[in-house]
C-alpha cells in the first residue's frame, strides 16, 4: 500500500512523472508548474514504494541553491535516508569523481580548482613570459574562447589563441590546477579512456534525475549520457522556453537531442501553472509560441485574473522608462497599500541597474541589488584564500604573487622576479 500523503496534491501529469520509474523520461515543465515538487515526490516514491536504495539515485541540479533546497525538502519527507541520495551540481559531481581518479589523468588528487580571476593572473604571466601583446588578444577574450572550446561551443582554436591555450594548459597541468571547464572535459576524458571507471559509476548511479536540462552544455549532456547508457533510467526535466544561459554554452537543443538519443522515452508535459493568473499566461503564451526550437505546449491556470494583470508601456528612451517605473512604484506604495519589498524590477543586464539606482536615490526609494557581487569574489576574501593556499603549498607562485604586497610592502616586480 502506498503512503500517499506526499502524492495527494499532485495533478495527473505530475503523478505520471512520479510513477514512471524505469526507462528514459523527458518532462517538459513550464514555469510555475510544480517541477521541483514533482522531482522531490519522485525520489520519495522511488525509495518508499519501489524500494530503490537511495545511494543508487543521482539528482543533478544546476545551482548549489537548488541542491540545498532539494536536500532540505527531501529530509522532511524521508529524514535520514535523504543523506544517502547523491544530490549535486554537475561541476561538483565531476570534481568528486576526479578527486578519486585524478591519477589516471596524471593529476594529483589534491588538484586546485581555479576561478576567472586566477585565470587572468595566469594568462598575465604567460603573456609576459611569451611577450604577447594584450591589445591583440586580451586575457578575458582568451579565457572566453578557451572556455567555449572546452565546452564544445567552439570547434577549433587557431593562431595566437591556440598558442595561448597550449601554454595555459601546460601551466595548469604543471601546477596541478583545473579550471571549471576542465572538471567537465577531464571527467568525460576519464570515462571514455577508462570503461571500467565509467561502469563503476553507472552501477552506482542506476537512477539519474536531471533538473534544468535546457541549461546544460554539450559536454555536460555527454557526461550525463555516458552515465545513463547502461541502465537507461534517466529522468530529465527542463523547459525549452526558459533557456537563458546560452552565453555559457548552454544548448537548448539538448532537450530535442534527448528524444533522438532515447527514442523510447516517455514524454510528459507539465502545463498547469500555480503561480500566475490565466490572463498573464495568455500573454506569455502569445509571445513564447514564436520560439522556433520548442516542444508545443500552452500553460494554463485555474486562477482567472483580470486584464489589468498585464500592462505594456512602450518607452522610446531609457529616461522615459526609468521615470515611468519610478512613478509606478511610488503610486503603488503611496496610494495602493503596497510595500517596497513587494516590488521587483527585472532588467536584461547588470549595466542597466545604474539608471534605476540614480532615480531611486533621488526619490528616496529603498532598494537592494541582488546577484551583483559574490562573496568569494571580493578582493579581501580572495587575498585570505591565497594566504592559506600558499601556506599549505609554498610552490604555488600564483598565490605568492597575489599576497606579496597585501598589505603593501613596497616589493617591486624586479625583486619578485
Residue ranges and their predicted role:
Residues 33, 210, 214-290, 300-304:
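Conserved helicase motor core of SF1/SF2 NTP-dependent helicases
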Residues 93-101, 241-248, 275-276, 371-392, ...:
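Short alpha-helix plus adjacent loop in nuclease-associated cores
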Residues 27, 33-39, 263-266, 271-366, ...:
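Helicase P-loop NTPase motor core
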Residues 3-4, 22-25, 30-33, 44-207, ...:
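A basic/glycine-biased coupling hinge at the interface between accessory DNA-binding modules
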Residues 43, 61-65, 89-92, 238-241, ...:
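A short beta-strand-to-loop transition that corresponds to the Sensor-1 phosphate-sensing loop
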Residues 6-22, 219:
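N-terminal pre-P-loop "Q-motif" helix
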Amino acid at each position: 500500500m502506498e503512503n500517499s500523503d506526499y502524492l495527494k496534491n499532485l495533478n495527473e501529469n505530475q503523478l505520471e512523472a512520479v510513477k514512471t520509474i524505469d526507462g528514459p523520461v523527458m518532462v517538459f515543465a513550464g514555469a510555475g508548474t510544480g517541477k521541483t515538487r514533482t522531482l522531490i515526490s519522485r525520489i520519495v516514491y522511488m525509495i518508499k514504494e519501489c524500494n530503490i536504495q537511495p545511494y543508487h539515485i543521482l539528482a543533478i541540479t544546476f545551482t548549489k541553491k537548488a541542491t540545498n533546497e532539494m536536500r532540505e525538502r527531501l529530509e522532511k519527507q524521508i529524514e535520514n535516508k535523504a543523506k544517502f541520495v547523491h544530490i549535486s551540481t554537475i561541476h561538483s559531481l565531476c570534481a568528486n569523481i576526479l578527486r578519486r581518479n585524478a591519477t589516471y589523468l596524471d593529476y594529483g588528487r589534491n588538484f586546485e580548482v581555479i576561478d576567472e580571476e586566477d585565470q587572468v593572473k595566469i594568462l598575465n604571466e604567460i603573456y609576459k613570459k611569451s611577450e604577447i601583446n594584450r591589445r591583440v588578444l586580451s586575457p578575458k577574450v582568451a579565457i572566453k574562447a578557451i572556455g567555449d572550446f572546452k565546452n564544445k561551443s567552439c570547434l577549433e582554436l587557431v593562431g595566437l589563441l591556440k598558442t595561448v591555450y597550449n601554454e595555459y594548459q601546460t601551466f595548469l597541468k604543471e601546477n596541478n590546477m583545473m579550471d571549471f571547464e576542465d572538471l567537465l572535459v577531464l571527467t568525460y576524458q576519464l570515462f571514455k579512456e577508462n570503461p571500467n571507471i565509467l561502469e563503476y559509476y553507472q552501477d552506482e548511479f542506476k537512477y539519474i534525475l536531471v533538473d534544468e536540462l535546457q541549461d546544460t552544455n554539450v559536454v555536460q549532456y555527454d557526461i550525463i549520457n555516458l552515465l545513463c547508457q547502461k541502465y537507461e533510467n534517466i529522468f530529465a526535466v527542463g523547459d525549452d522556453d526558459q533557456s537563458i544561459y546560452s552565453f555559457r554554452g548552454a544548448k537548448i537543443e539538448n532537450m530535442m537531442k534527448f528524444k533522438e538519443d532515447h527514442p523510447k522515452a516517455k514524454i510528459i508535459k507539465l502545463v498547469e501553472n500555480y503561480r500566475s493568473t490565466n490572463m498573464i499566461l495568455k500573454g506569455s503564451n502569445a509571445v513564447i509560441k514564436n520560439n522556433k526550437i520548442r516542444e508545443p505546449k500552452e500553460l494554463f491556470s485555474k486562477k482567472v485574473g483580470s486584464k489589468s494583470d498585464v500592462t505594456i508601456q512602450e518607452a522610446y528612451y531609457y529616461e522615459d522608462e526609468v521615470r515611468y517605473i519610478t512613478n509606478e512604484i511610488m503610486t503603488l506604495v503611496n496610494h495602493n497599500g503596497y510595500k517596497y519589498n513587494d516590488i521587483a524590477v527585472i532588467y536584461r543586464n547588470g549595466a542597466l541597474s545604474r539608471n534605476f539606482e540614480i532615480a531611486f536615490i533621488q526619490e528616496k526609494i529603498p532598494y537592494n541589488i541582488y546577484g551583483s557581487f559574490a562573496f568569494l569574489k571580493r578582493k579581501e576574501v580572495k587575498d585570505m584564500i591565497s594566504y592559506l593556499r600558499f601556506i599549505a603549498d609554498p610552490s604555488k607562485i600564483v598565490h605568492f604573487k597575489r599576497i606579496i604586497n597585501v598589505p603593501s610592502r613596497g616589493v617591486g616586480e624586479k625583486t619578485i622576479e
